[in-house]
């Protein structure tokens, strides 16, 4: 098998063959060689099952109609992507890049102190969220740990960007 090394010319918008080599294992290849990877969806970690019972964290989502959905997550799961895995209607339009408030949730007061303190960027976004409460957080910024066992997350009645043109949120 051969490995072709190409250099792209910015001037002529073309590629020039630099050398032809026998392919070597990935850790021996030059830095400018082309590598490809398998595409991954956002929240890939959340789509994996817990490896042991020690990792399991049980939480409950309460949707805008009051329907309660108990979910079994694991330590390190992102609350937004975990909701997507279990078909809970939490949009997450910016895909956890801290650019919207569509994953806005209300955290039970008992569990608020167990969460990491919100960073300034999250607080700034929450200021723009409709139906803001003192226990409001962005779901994309909450990572589960064992201290959150039994936590309840309530979804607000509406968020900005939600159901635009009849859109129903789906995992990305």
From Swiss-Prot:
Residue stretches making up the 2Fe-2S ferredoxin-type domain: 57-159
Q: Which cofactor does it need?
A: [2Fe-2S] cluster
Q: Which UniProt keywords apply?
A: 2Fe-2S, Electron transport, Iron, Iron-sulfur, Lipid metabolism, Metal-binding, Mitochondrion, Steroid metabolism, Steroidogenesis, Transit peptide, Transport
* Gene Ontology CC: one annotated term: mitochondrial matrix
Null mutant phenotype reads: RNAi-mediated knockdown in the whole body or in the prothoracic gland results in delayed or absent pupariation.
Q: Could you confirm whether the keyword Chaperone appears in this record?
A: no
Q: Which residues bind [2Fe-2S] cluster?
A: 94, 100, 103, 140
Protein family (similarity comment): Belongs to the adrenodoxin/putidaredoxin family.
Task: Name the job this protein performs.
Answer: Required for ecdysteroidogenesis in the prothoracic gland which is necessary for larval to pupal transition.
What is the protein's given name? Adrenodoxin-like protein 1, mitochondrial
């Amino acid at each position: 098998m051969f490995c072709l090394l190409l250099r792209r010319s910015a001037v002529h918008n073309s590629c020039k063959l630099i050398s032809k080599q026998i392919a070597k294992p990935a850790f021996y290849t030059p830095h400018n060689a082309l590598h490809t990877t398998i595409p991954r969806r956002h929240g890939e970690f959340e789509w994996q099952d817990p490896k042991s019972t020690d990792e399991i964290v049980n939480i409950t989502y309460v949707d805008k109609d009051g329907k309660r959905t108990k979910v079994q997550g694991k330590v390190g799961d992102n609350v937004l992507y975990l909701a997507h895995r279990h078909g809970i209607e939490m949009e997450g339009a910016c895909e956890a890049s801290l650019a919207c408030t569509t994953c806005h949730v209300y955290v039970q007061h008992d569990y608020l102190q167990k969460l990491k303190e919100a960073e300034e960027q999250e607080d700034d976004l929450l200021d723009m969220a409709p139906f803001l409460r003192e226990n409001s957080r962005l779901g994309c910024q909450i990572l589960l740990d064992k201290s959150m066992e039994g936590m309840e997350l309530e979804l607000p009645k509406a968020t900005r960007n939600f159901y635009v043109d009849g859109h129903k949120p789906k995992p990305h």
